């Protein structure tokens, strides 16, 4: 089993005729992702990389049966693209776009309440189920099938963690980038719940960063509900208060959201934390050995 997407997932690309979308569409197709449609208003009838282009999400869904969309639309128009995907009742929309205005996302989040469409992102690397389906911008080759779930606010730290695991012979089920913006769709707890219920996932790596309280809330949820070992890492440990570190959501304000606070809460809830990015893999191995599942996690031929 996998989380959110698998080899049978039919995907549409919103904004497919843009240069960034074209580049990543080719990468996703090469990985084996079933991209069945593209959407660019006014460009319906074209074919790019063998993928038919439609004017609307509704039309693309009806013609191809796509259930998931990935958005590479420029920031000023991205919120409308998410709303269009939700109106078409897609199962999931993965928004890669960065710099969407916060107020736009507040409206989107409100609009999605009570609807079936799950939003992942924005400002995220996407979702990948190893060796099956890649939706987003992550480097596919570092991901290998196995039993560790990865959930992260940071794209590049996801790649770092996955690469370390693969190098150690430890494969992954699904890696989910939830994005670095202050207002997003899917949060840590949503993904942790999915991993907890997934038979194939035996352990989880959770990567957070300064700003907000998402990691603290996740830690409390892990303590109360999680039946599998979780290890963590918090980015931004050297950040001074009030200084944004990369992501829009990565800022310490009002004394809240510090790395120190987050690490303390995670540790108190039984989550082992890596001190540096280079120790994420070894921290997971340590936790797996303690849980008696290390041998089970060795699925990649080194």
From Swiss-Prot:
Annotated Gene Ontology cellular component terms: cytosol; succinate-CoA ligase complex (ADP-forming)
Keyword terms of this UniProt record: Ligase, Nucleotide-binding, Tricarboxylic acid cycle
Subunit annotation: Heterotetramer of two alpha and two beta subunits.
Residue positions binding substrate: 159
Segments traversing the membrane: none
Entry-linked InterPro entries: Cit_synth/succinyl-CoA_lig_AS, Citrt_syn/SCS-alpha_CS, CoA-bd, CoA_lig_alpha, NAD(P)-bd_dom_sf, SUCC_ACL_C, Succinyl-CoA_synth-like
Stored PROSITE patterns: SUCCINYL_COA_LIG_1, SUCCINYL_COA_LIG_2
Record's protein name: Succinate--CoA ligase [ADP-forming] subunit alpha
Catalytic residues (UniProt): 247 (tele-phosphohistidine intermediate)
Catalytic activity, as annotated: succinate + ATP + CoA = succinyl-CoA + ADP + phosphate; GTP + succinate + CoA = succinyl-CoA + GDP + phosphate
Role this protein plays: Succinyl-CoA synthetase functions in the citric acid cycle (TCA), coupling the hydrolysis of succinyl-CoA to the synthesis of either ATP or GTP and thus represents the only step of substrate-level phosphorylation in the TCA. The alpha subunit of the enzyme binds the substrates coenzyme A and phosphate, while succinate binding and nucleotide specificity is provided by the beta subunit.
UniProt cross-references to Pfam families, sorted A to Z: CoA_binding (PF02629), Ligase_CoA (PF00549)
EC category name: ligase
Keyword Ligase: yes
Alphabetical list of NCBIfam families matching this protein: PRK05678.1, sucCoAalpha
PANTHER family on file: SUCCINATE--COA LIGASE [ADP_GDP-FORMING] SUBUNIT ALPHA, MITOCHONDRIAL, SUCCINYL-COA LIGASE SUBUNIT ALPHA
Single biological process term from Gene Ontology: tricarboxylic acid cycle
Family: Belongs to the succinate/malate CoA ligase alpha subunit family.
Gene3D superfamilies: NAD(P)-binding Rossmann-like Domain, Succinyl-CoA synthetase domains
Pathway(s) of this molecule: Carbohydrate metabolism; tricarboxylic acid cycle; succinate from succinyl-CoA (ligase route): step 1/1
Enzyme Commission number(s) of this protein: 6.2.1.5
């Amino acid at each position: 089993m996998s989380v959110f997407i698998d080899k049978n997932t039919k995907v549409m690309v919103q904004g497919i005729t843009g240069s960034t979308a074209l580049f990543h569409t080719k990468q996703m197709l090469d990985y084996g992702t079933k991209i069945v449609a593209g959407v660019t208003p006014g460009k319906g009838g074209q074919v790019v990389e063998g993928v038919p282009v439609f004017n609307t999400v509704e039309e693309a869904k009806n013609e191809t049966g796509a259930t998931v969309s990935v958005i590479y639309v420029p920031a000023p128009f991205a919120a409308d693209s998410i709303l269009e995907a939700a109106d078409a009742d897609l199962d999931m929309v993965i928004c890669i776009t960065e710099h969407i205005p916060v107020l736009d996302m507040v409206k989107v989040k409100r609009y999605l309440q009570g609807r079936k469409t799950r939003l992942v992102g924005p400002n995220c690397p996407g979702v990948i189920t190893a060796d099956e389906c890649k939706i987003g911008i992550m480097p596919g080759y570092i991901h290998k099938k196995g039993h560790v779930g990865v959930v992260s606010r940071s794209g590049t730290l996801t790649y770092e963690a996955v690469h370390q695991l693969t190098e150690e012979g430890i494969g992954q089920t699904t890696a989910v980038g939830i994005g670095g913006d202050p207002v997003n769709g899917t949060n840590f707890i949503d993904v942790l719940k999915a991993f907890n219920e997934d038979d194939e996932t035996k352990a989880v790596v959770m990567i957070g960063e300064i700003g907000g309280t998402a990691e603290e809330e996740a830690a409390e949820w892990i303590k109360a509900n999680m039946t599998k070992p979780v290890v963590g890492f918090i980015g931004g440990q050297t950040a001074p208060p009030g200084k944004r570190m990369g992501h829009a959501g990565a800022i310490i304000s009002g004394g809240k959201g510090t790395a120190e606070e987050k690490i303390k809460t995670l540790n108190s809830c039984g989550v082992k934390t890596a001190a540096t990015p280079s120790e994420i893999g070894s921290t997971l191995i340590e936790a797996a050995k303690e849980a008696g599942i290390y041998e089970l996690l060795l699925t990649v031929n080194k």
